[in-house]
């Protein structure tokens, strides 16, 4: 399967990329290689093979939410460049 430079330009436009003609030619070749590889994968016989959603067999482990206090307010505020004793002071944005 091949892809034209015009198709590459359309894809680049969607991504808001500006490509010169050399890059369009380069990417057209690379896209063609990727699509050929996908065609090769599509030829693999997968009849009787269960769908695989994750290569790792694991179960989600749930735990109870427990409130834990890791740092005191003073310890947290000690890392702030500026604070008022209760809150971080940050520059005004708007």
UniProtKB/Swiss-Prot annotation:
It comes from Oleidesulfovibrio alaskensis (strain ATCC BAA-1058 / DSM 17464 / G20). Allows the formation of correctly charged Asn-tRNA(Asn) or Gln-tRNA(Gln) through the transamidation of misacylated Asp-tRNA(Asn) or Glu-tRNA(Gln) in organisms which lack either or both of asparaginyl-tRNA or glutaminyl-tRNA synthetases. The reaction takes place in the presence of glutamine and ATP through an activated phospho-Asp-tRNA(Asn) or phospho-Glu-tRNA(Gln). It holds the Pfam family GatC. InterPro entries: Asp/Glu-ADT_sf_sub_c, GatC. Heterotrimer of A, B and C subunits. One of its GO terms (molecular function) is glutaminyl-tRNA synthase (glutamine-hydrolyzing) activity. Keywords: ATP-binding, Ligase, Nucleotide-binding, Protein biosynthesis. Its EC number is 6.3.5.-. Signal peptide: none annotated. Belongs to the GatC family. It catalyses: L-glutamyl-tRNA(Gln) + L-glutamine + ATP + H2O = L-glutaminyl-tRNA(Gln) + L-glutamate + ADP + phosphate + H(+); L-aspartyl-tRNA(Asn) + L-glutamine + ATP + H2O = L-asparaginyl-tRNA(Asn) + L-glutamate + ADP + phosphate + 2 H(+). GO terms for biological process: glutaminyl-tRNAGln biosynthesis via transamidation; regulation of translational fidelity; translation. The gene is gatC. Gene3D superfamilies: Glu-tRNAGln amidotransferase C subunit, N-terminal domain. This is Aspartyl/glutamyl-tRNA(Asn/Gln) amidotransferase subunit C.
């Amino acid at each position: 399967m091949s892809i034209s430079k015009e198709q590459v330009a359309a894809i680049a436009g969607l991504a808001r990329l500006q490509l010169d003609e050399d890059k369009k030619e380069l990417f057209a070749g690379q896209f063609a290689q990727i699509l050929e590889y996908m065609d090769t994968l599509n030829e693999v016989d997968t009849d009787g093979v269960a769908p695989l959603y994750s290569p790792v067999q694991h179960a989600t482990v749930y735990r109870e939410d427990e409130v834990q206090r890791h740092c005191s307010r003073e310890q947290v505020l000690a890392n702030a460049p500026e604070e008022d004793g209760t809150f971080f002071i940050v520059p005004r944005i708007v």
